[in-house]
Amino acid sequence: MKVLLINGSPHEKGCTYTALSLIAGELNAAGIETEILNVGTKPVGGCIGCGGCAAGKGCVFGGVVNGAIEKAKTADAFVFGTPVHYASASGNMTSFMDRLAYAGGRYLAYKPAAICCSARRAGTTSTLDQLVKYPEFFHMPLVSGSYWPMVHGSNPEQVLQDAEGCAVMQELGRNMAWLLRCIEAGKAAGIQHPENPRRPMTNFIR
């Protein structure tokens, strides 16, 4: 089994990475492979609604999004992490998630997901509210802990001083490992995820 962790921070080894590493550490301890994918510092343009991804060949703009889609095909679960920028996910992470969802949502469906964010001080809850919208759109079981998944600090050393936040990250890793094993056991017993029909599309204004 493998979990793909997305680092939406422009700092490759910063606070968000520290939080994701705590999650990955617990997954690794349970015998689950992990990979942290950095969205990076190059600008990630937003989705323009062109519909080109409907052909099933990824996003027409390519880049880190299509690289993530390829990795998503073989991943069993995901963790989406971001720093807090003006009480929301980073700009690159927002564009990345929008395009990943539109062009690669079929590879996210029914796979467990966790979210987390890192901030110096505030804006965490609104950021988590933003991130949770993506797994809720694709039938993804949401992995939680004993508190909202956030850490605080201006640098990795300070994040590690946030004992409660770090403990919650570790809970996410352990709980995700448990859920993945449950899903694996279910498959071995012949239990598959439901095949839901395509939902009807209705507009608020006819």
Per-region residue spans from a language model:
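Glycine-rich phosphate/pyrophosphate-binding loop and the adjoining helix
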Residues: 141-206
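N-terminal beta1-alpha1 ligand-phosphate binding loop
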Residues: 2-30
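Helix-loop-strand module that forms the ligand-binding subsite of alpha/beta enzymes
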Residues: 55, 60-147
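Cysteine-cluster motifs in flexible loop/terminal segments that predominantly coordinate metals
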Residues: 42-72, 200-206
